[in-house]
Amino acid sequence: MVVGIGAWGPGFSDWPTLKTLLRDGVSDTPLTVANPAPQIIPANERRRAPLPVKIAVEVSWQALQQSGLAASDVACVFGSGLGDTEITDYMCRVLTTELKQLSPTKFHNSVHNAAAGYWTISSGCMKSANSIAAYHQTAGLALLEGISQCVLQQEPVLITLFDTEAHATYRQIFPCEQSFGAAILVQPMTAQPINAQSKEAKPIVLTLSNEQPAVAQVELADPYLASLAATNPAAGILGLLSLLAQSPSAQPACTSLGIGPARAISLTVEHRQ
């Protein structure tokens, strides 16, 4: 079941705000939001952390706080379809110069599991930390990995997805123009939510199919959110989040996410009164 959710993107800096947007649509006001500055990262490290890391840690911290669980007891799965294209561009350009002198800080932040490293060190996480990259299949594979681990290991798992606006050099192949991050914290159905804020905990049923399932992806009515979901790999989770945003009186609803050629997972959200 889902016991914590975090979110950040243009027009929203937390789950309650995104929840309203998913229910009511995007307003006509400019969709802006300040870059996150997760206080859980020490100040010196926070100044050096790139935007993808800040987004990932911010939404992870939001979900953890909502759950009431201790970070040391929660395993984590981080997923980013693009990685940090700003640093990728920087490293490629520097390596074409005669001296090839890379910034140690940028090189340190260039690894794909940088966000997981910042999170585990800053939060005190003592459980496993995985990082996944699969372009537009990233959201589906991260959810498959995290939910499977939750069920098989009978432990809570934080699933964090994040992707930032692609650097202009890569825009023709990665048409991602908006940054987005979201995290959901799942725990086994046998466990009881320990935080009053988690009284809206919602069970999720996951089904693996060898072919594209009969269940279609949830269509987002709002054009802005639909575009975000189509172009930002991490935002592929918006269909699932739209189901989680529904009122407790809503009927069980399904969505699907691709995890590879002719292969997908189906997710069913069951709301409790």
Would you name each region that the model predicts?
Residues 1-107, 111-112, 116-128, 162-273:
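Conserved "HGTGT" condensation-loop signature of ketosynthase/thiolase-family condensing enzymes
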Residues 56-61, 66, 133-156:
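Active-site-proximal alpha-helical scaffold in enzymes
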Residues 158-160:
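Nucleic-acid nuclease catalytic cores
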